[in-house]
Amino acid sequence: MNPVEDKYVLDVSETETVVQRINEYNEAIKAAAASKNLALADVHGFLNNVKDGVRINGLAVSAKYITGNAFSLDGIHLTPIGNALMANIFISAINSKYGSKIPQVDVAKYRGVKMPDTAPATK
């Protein structure tokens, strides 16, 4: 017995449909960028790599909740480190496509999850 009603969760078939649509959407983006000769940042690939865990300049980054450094406490939005890594994906795509020399962001200058202050207020 599942405590959550079916209308609130995806079953296997629905999950497969979502994955298929994501892949179709990403292919459409890739085709649109190619048709206009534009740089393409592989955000989907980046997020999949983070999901599996990566090491950047000795810093471990993953999608692991709280300790993974990539996602904030809401589990959806990127942390400053996650945003710095994402910026580097865009910078790499631009540099590669256009021969630019935009420097990469130094990820070590950014923080991961900022824990809320749980200390009692003092007077």
What kind of region is each of these model predictions?
Residues P3-E5, Q20, Q104, K123:
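Residue-identity detector for glutamine
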Residues M1-E16, K30-H77:
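Mobile gating loops/cap/lid regions near enzyme active sites that modulate substrate access
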Residues T118-T122:
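Charge-dense, extended regions
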